[in-house]
Amino acid sequence: MKKTIKMLMSSLLVAVGLAACGSNSSSSSTNAANRLTMTTFGELTTLDSADYDDVPSSDMMGQIFEGLYRVAANNKVELGMAAQEPKVSEDGLVYTFTLRDAKWSDGSAVKAQDFVFTYRKLVNPQEGHVAQSADVFKNAKKIRSGELPVEELGVKALDDKTLEITLENPAPYLPKLLTG
């Protein structure tokens, strides 16, 4: 009897193993290249990169948006949307970035003005959430307190591919701050 049970169990394990190795011939590759499936441990509250305060939304945005820099697998900061390291003024206050070519999901080009829009939204007191971490940008603190309009933020699009960031004070940690 024991020998029969062992044979049945061995046969079952082999059958399950072979079934797991097989392919699903009914699956379709239609739009498979255009779809990303991810699991989160909680409900997403937003996909607005300037208006989140929960971990699931933050994790998801880290997967779908990219900053001027990104954190590599070795936990080191590397270029993201920046095509090359920025030109930095002698006083360490002005950073000029050239953006690499990239497109939004609708096919339109990512432009420097998109970054300006996002950074302005981050410090705009009328948007609800205001990021104190953006206080490194020129005038950010005064904008957050309502003393200046968001247009005075030290972030400017010089053209479609060139972004200029002016700081209040030198910030050697700026690349880490500008990760997606």
Predicted features and spans:
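Aromatic- and charge-enriched surface segment that lines or borders ligand/interaction sites
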Residues: Q84-V130
